From Swiss-Prot:
This is Exocyst complex component 1. Residues 64-76, 519-532 have a biased composition (Polar residues). The exocyst complex is composed of sec3/exoc1, sec5/exoc2, sec6/exoc3, sec8/exoc4, sec10/exoc5, sec15/exoc6, exo70/exoc7 and exo84/exoc8. Pfam families: Sec3_C-term, Sec3_CC. The gene is exoc1. One of its GO terms (molecular function) is phosphatidylinositol-4,5-bisphosphate binding.
Length: 879
């Protein structure tokens, strides 16, 4: 910028405005006029261009660029290259090559210096040009216009110089970008080489096992703590070398493949040693625990709890990392270990279960068997119901009142419990026992309790409930009560048990191949060992459609192990359920409630749940519902089989006993309105009520149409039923209460009309016919009808004077007292309704008599009201 010749050309323009000329002359006075001669612009275009090129100031380039064109373009000097070429043929060519490279590096540094200097120069030029334009503003425009007018040729030269300089700058920019591109490529290559070097180091470290690790894998020492720790660490190193996922392509390297083949041989050998070690531990533990069981049983007889075996679990947990490694690295060798584990511990667990249940049976309180046949016609049943009725009439039933006297102390000091309380205690102990064993199996064999998928029903939800489906189940069971079939089932069950005792391992070591999930409905499942009395009830029913096969899970053996270990739990629990059914079927409801509380608790997806515990309780739940539905069917059959006369029958026994049945059931109902036990109770009410209504309708249909007992029996029984349901005030019975009230009112109207017709039928018929005539005739024409003339009117009213009306009401009252139960408030209800209907009719008769005959009835409606009151007071119920 210092050598540009602007000032000479600008000073000769002769600008009139001193302000702008002074600024420009001051700015460019530093340049000499000799550097730029405007007279030379008259030359030819080519000469002018060459002249400008010669007058453009030359920047100071680096030393290697200041040489001749040949030297700059060809890099190093000819002498250097020739000497280098000559020296390449000599023995010391390596040193000359090094000199060439050093020269190249020095030249590269000069390029960097040049690039930096050019950048600074360009920045200065751009800044000064922009500042000058902004400061000059209008003055610049005037100067340019004057320059264009007076000497445009000078600007042409300046423009050419600027274009040349721009071209040089563009070339320099391309050169700089070229250099930067090479530098970037070199940097990328360097970075990739570093990453490759790092990955190769990692691969070498991963594919290399130390000598100690190899010796441990080859000859592990499991007997001492240090050797076991070294074996676990060596197993982890081997696992990492075999399973770590390498970068793309590295796993296909021949060296990696060969090394992993060697590691596979280590894995196979080490897995075989681990499997043998764990199997020996299981066998040893089996013997030790067997001795422990014998010792503790002899020392603490009658102890109502399960042994914990914590010290043996702690011993086995030391080898847990090796078992977990074996499952992940060689799962095929784990399968025989699971079978060995089952064989080692199943016998011990079966012994624990039998001992526990036999021990708690000693604390069972003896109770007399009471089937509570509320609707049976036997004398013992009537006696039992009468006692219940007396108890409920003198005391208010409370929730779970049976628990107040559920336990007592016997002569031997053992705490006595009722069967339902004993069942609850057994469930609490079983939960702890099973959860402890399950947690150990899950931790030791690295299994997870499979969570239930969202939207899927639990595997226990298919058990028979107390809803509408239970009606069908009950009807199916009703046809299966023959004693021969029960005996046959019990015999078959006994044969199966004997066979199982002879060959305990034949059916108790199911295959674990392929980790197939366990089907609880399979005949081989140990949880299907239910009592013969239950299996016989479902023998002739068609099998339900098979459920869709569950998805296979790697954790399915967990259920298999637990099923094999605790195959005696379900039969023991069902045995307690059957004993409770024999003593008091209502105990089944409390058992069902307790069972479902555990099912709900273990159906939640948290850390403390057991799908297996839910499964075995679901079988118990199903058995409880089956037995209770069977009890209900006994009650239904008792109702159906009852044949009785409806003549002056009063309230039938079955209708009288229903509220007692309800009160007893309510004692065993849970406080919450949800749950299967509540649904079962409510469905029981519905089933019995519908059967009662159908049974009474069946008895009524057998009577002739003209029999008064058809409506009298319905009237009295449904009135009693309505009052009792109203007294119970149970929400689920509201609909049935309304139904009984409707039937009662319907038959009340029929009976009242029947009573009126006993003595007042002619009067009713006379005025009924008159109402029909009034539909077509005016009231004044009625007296001209032969059937309703004034003479006929006088005859009819003469028959129903005061004394005759009183006799008619006496006869009606006598009929009511004769057919309705003594001291029943229904008598007064009927009498009051009779009074309402009769007076309503009589007042209507008075109105049409006045309209048609212009006369009055001999007895007024007020007099009739007095007659009703007098008759009822003078004639109390005498029968």
């Amino acid at each position: 910028m210092d050598h540009l010749g602007y000032s000479g050309g600008i000073s000769r323009v002769g600008i009139q405005h001193n302000r702008y000329s002074g600024q420009f002359s001051d700015r460019y006075s530093q340049y000499s006029e000799s550097e730029y001669d405007p007279s030379e612009t008259t030359h030819s275009e080519s000469d002018s261009e060459n002249h400008h090129h010669s007058n453009i100031p030359i920047l100071e380039y680096p030393s290697f660029l200041s040489q001749s064109n040949d030297n700059v373009s060809n890099g190093p000097s000819n002498n250097t290259l020739s000497s280098s070429a000559t020296s390449l043929g000599n023995n010391d060519g390596d040193e000359d090559l090094e000199n060439v490279i050093n020269n190249y590096l020095s030249f590269e540094k000069d390029v960097d210096i040049l690039t930096e200097r050019l950048g600074k120069t360009l920045s200065t030029l751009e800044t000064e040009m922009i500042v000058g334009v902004l400061d000059s503003g209008v003055g610049v425009n005037e100067v340019i216009s004057q320059l264009g007018d007076k000497d445009g040729t000078h600007l042409t030269g300046v423009t050419a110089w600027i274009e040349y300089y721009n071209k040089q700058l563009q070339d320099m920019k391309k050169y700089i970008e070229h250099i930067e591109g090479k530098n970037n490529k070199m940097e990328i290559v360097s970075r990739n080489q570093k990453l490759l070097y790092s990955e190769l180091n990692n691969l070498i470290g991963l594919m290399t096992l130390s000598d100690n690790t190899i010796s441990t894998l080859t000859a592990p020492q499991f007997n001492d703590t240090k050797g076991l720790k070294m074996a676990i660490e060596a197993a982890e190193d081997l696992k990492r070398a075999l399973t770590t996922k390498l970068k793309s392509g590295m796993d296909n390297m021949m060296a990696v493949k060969d090394q992993r083949k060697v590691f596979e041989t280590y894995k196979i050998s080490f897995a075989r040693k681990v499997a043998a070690l764990v199997e020996n531990i299981f066998k040893t533990t089996d013997k030790e625990i067997g001795k422990h069981v014998i010792t503790t049983t002899s020392q603490t007889p009658g102890e109502e709890k399960f042994p914990d075996y914590l010290e043996y679990y702690d011993l086995l947990r030391k080898f847990k990392p090796l078992v977990n490694w074996l499952k992940e690295m060689d799962h095929e060798k784990l399968i025989p270990l699971i079978v060995s584990y089952i064989k080692a511990f199943r016998r011990i667990y079966e012994s624990d279960i039998k001992l526990f249940f036999s021990t708690i049976q000693q604390s069972l309180e003896k109770e007399s068997k009471d089937q509570n046949d509320f609707f049976s016609s036997s004398s013992s049943s009537k006696k039992s119901i009468d006692s219940l009725n007396n108890n409920t009439s003198t005391s208010t039933p409370s929730k779970n009142s049976s628990s107040s006297s559920s336990s007592s102390s016997g002569k031997d000091g053992i705490k006595k419990r009722k069967i339902n309380r004993l069942f609850k205690y057994a469930l609490s102990c079983l939960e702890i026992y099973i959860m402890t064993k399950q947690n150990f199996v899950m931790d030791f064999f690295l299994y997870q309790d499979p969570p239930r998928l969202a939207g899927q029903r639990n595997h226990h939800s298919n058990s028979s409930g107390g809803g509408s489906g239970s009606n069908k189940d009950g009807k199916d069971r009703k046809d299966k009560k023959s004693s021969k079939k029960d005996k046959k089932d019990k015999k078959d069950k006994k044969d199966k048990k004997d066979k199982k005792k002879k060959d305990p391992d034949s059916s108790s070591s199911p295959s674990l191949d392929n980790d197939k999930p366990i089907d609880s409905n399979s005949p081989k499942s140990p949880n299907n060992a239910v009592n013969g009395s239950l299996s016989s009830t479902e023998e002739s029913s068609p099998p339900p459609p098979p459920p869709p096969p569950p998805k296979e899970s790697p954790d399915a053996p967990l259920d298999l192990i637990l099923s094999a270990m605790f195959n005696g739990v379900v039969p023991e629990l069902i045995n307690m359920v059957e004993k409770a059914d024999q003593v008091n079927p209502f105990y089944l409801l409390t058992m069902l409630l307790e069972t479902e509380l555990y099912i709900d608790a273990h159906s939640r997806k948290d850390s403390h749940h057991s799908s297996y515990f839910v499964k075995i309780l679901a079988e118990v739940q199903k058995s409880i519902k089956t037995l209770f539905n069977k009890f209900l069917e006994v009650q239904v059959d008792a109702i159906k089989s009852t044949q009785t006369s409806l003549k002056r029958c009063g309230v039938l026994p079955h209708f009288r006993n229903f509220h007692i049945f309800v009160k007893e059931l309510q004692k065993y109902k849970s406080e919450s309105d949800t749950g299967s036990s509540t649904l079962l109770i409510e469905s029981s009410y519905k089933k019995i009520i519908l059967e009662l209504f159908n049974w009474l309708d069946g008895l009524v249909e057998k009577l002739p149409e003209d029999k008064k007992y058809k409506f009298i029996s319905k009237l009295e029984n449904h009135y009693f039923f309505y009052l009792k349901l109203q007294e119970l005030n149970i929400n689920c019975l509201t609909q049935h209460k309304d139904t009984s009230q409707s039937i009662f009112k319907e038959n009340l109207e029929i009976y009242v009309n029947f009573l009126i017709d006993l003595k007042f039928k002619p009067l009713i018929e006379y005025y009924t016919k008159m109402d029909e005539l009034l539909l077509t005739l005016p009231p004044s024409d009625i007296q001209f009808q032969q059937s309703h003339s004034k003479q006929q009117f006088k005859k009819i009213v003469e028959k129903f004077k005061t004394e005759n009306i009183e006799k008619g009401l006496l006869k009606a009252l006598g009929n009511v007292q004769k057919n309705i139960t003594k001291d029943s408030q229904l008598i007064l209800v009927i009498w009051e309704r009779l009074e309402e209907v009769f007076i309503e009719k009589y007042e209507h008769f008075q109105d049409i008599t006045s309209d048609c005959y212009n006369q009055t009835m001999p007895v007024s409606s007020d007099q009739i009201k007095g007659i009703f009151g007098t008759v009822y007071k003078k004639n109390p119920n005498k029968h």
